[in-house]
Amino acid sequence: MQLCIISLWFLAAFIVNADNVQFEDYESNFFFKEHLGTLSPYHEPYFDGLDSAFPETCEIQQVHLLQRHGSRNPTGDVTATDVYSSQYLNNFQEKLLNGSIPVNFSYPENPLCFIKQWTPVIDAENADQLSSRGRLELFDLGRQLYQRYYKLFDSYVYDINTAEQERVVESAKWFTYGLFGDKMYEKTNFILISEGKAAGANSLSMYNACPVFKDNNFHKNATDAAHAVWRNIFIEPIVNRLAKYFDSSYKLTINDVRSLFYICEYEIAIKDHSDFCSIFTPSEFLNFEYDSDLDQAYGGGPVSEWASTLGGAYINNLADSLRNVTNPDFDRKVFLAFTHDSNIIPVEAALGFFPDITPQNPLPTDKNIYTYSQKTSSFVPFAGNLITELFFCSDSKYYVRHLVNQQVYPLIDCGYGPSGTSDGLCELQAYLNSPIRANSTSNGISIFNTECQARPTNVTIYF
């Protein structure tokens, strides 16, 4: 017991700076919260440092938001067999507390000694629900969007397009509270879009609206195969390293280590701190991040042959709205859509954001290559978003620009903005006609309908 108290003191001293874990070979700090894959808290990515201010010679004409829901509790699974589910983690927590998974508290400086005083915050009754942090994330993003684009808010009522899952709808509501305050209900028209096949090409849950993709389990088959290889490679050394912190009679498993890591991630999402995070090294955080990146890349992102099909319908809809800027009968300027992380990555892949990753040049599953474009921590953390801006500039031309979590994405395939420099802007027609995305901007909806054998819909929704 004395050993545990002493080591808790050392652990507390470490936790004071736990957010800034140092790499031994790096001078800069390692911020582990920015490397939790799709479960990372909201943060801005590190691109090329392009200025996100409006260009001096341009006026904003349209803004299009594709927004992920905020930080949440683990998802639900009544069978309690999915390691990342609330029910599984709830059971795992109970085993840690009742000794079914026996921690060796007599081991000198055991980093798990805190468990004796630990109060779990993951509760199966809260499965799928936003955390208070998630609500605040969306409220603040709504406030910031209004401050930035207030000149465009000249209509009385705005369509709020949202996938119908509860946490997405709630996220949209908190966002619009940030936009409009107590006038939210009179200023908004919520359009709840089915997360099943009924939505067709209007879907904000493209996987589920594409019967060929969903019914053939393309997502699950691809990701399961990738994870089976990578997890056996990178988690086994963690099992061996952590085994000494448990009683010798207990055989620590890969799923145990995954559970410890998920508790770290979800406690961050719920209360912004977790002692469990201190048991992992920087390189282990990066390998778990890579595991998340493999999931998105193979499941429907740039490694998948389906990426442009799944993302193309949204891009086609977006492109039609951009083209309509010169239509005097088209007066929409603000376009708001709310969805999940796995539906943003295919859109960004189809836009050409991840040119180094293709079906022919996939992310390897037997090693972490570290330098690659599709970092889910940067592109789709909790509350992550993709913003498309349309400007009219002093040269009498329209220009497009993308922001990822408020940072300018450096478009390089369609020329420059009016400054003549690489500023992230592309002239509208060059953007629409670039070989990288022309098929999606012109034919994305018809391709989705054909390849997916999607359900036809006569409803017009504007993204």
Curated annotation (Swiss-Prot):
Keyword Glycoprotein part of the UniProt annotation: yes
Induction: Repressed by thiamine.
Pfam families, per the entry: His_Phos_2
Active site: H69, D341
Molecular functions per Gene Ontology: acid phosphatase activity; inositol phosphate phosphatase activity
Cell compartments where the protein resides: Secreted, Cell wall
UniProt cross-references to PROSITE patterns, sorted A to Z: HIS_ACID_PHOSPHAT_1 (PS00616), HIS_ACID_PHOSPHAT_2 (PS00778)
Sites carrying sugar chains: N98, N104, N221, N324, N439, N458
Signal peptide positions on this chain: 1-18
Similarity field: Belongs to the histidine acid phosphatase family.
PANTHER family: ACID PHOSPHATASE PHO11-RELATED, MULTIPLE INOSITOL POLYPHOSPHATE PHOSPHATASE-RELATED
Protein name: Thiamine-repressible acid phosphatase SPBC21H7.03c
Native organism: Schizosaccharomyces pombe (strain 972 / ATCC 24843)
Lineage of origin: Eukaryota, Fungi, Dikarya, Ascomycota, Taphrinomycotina
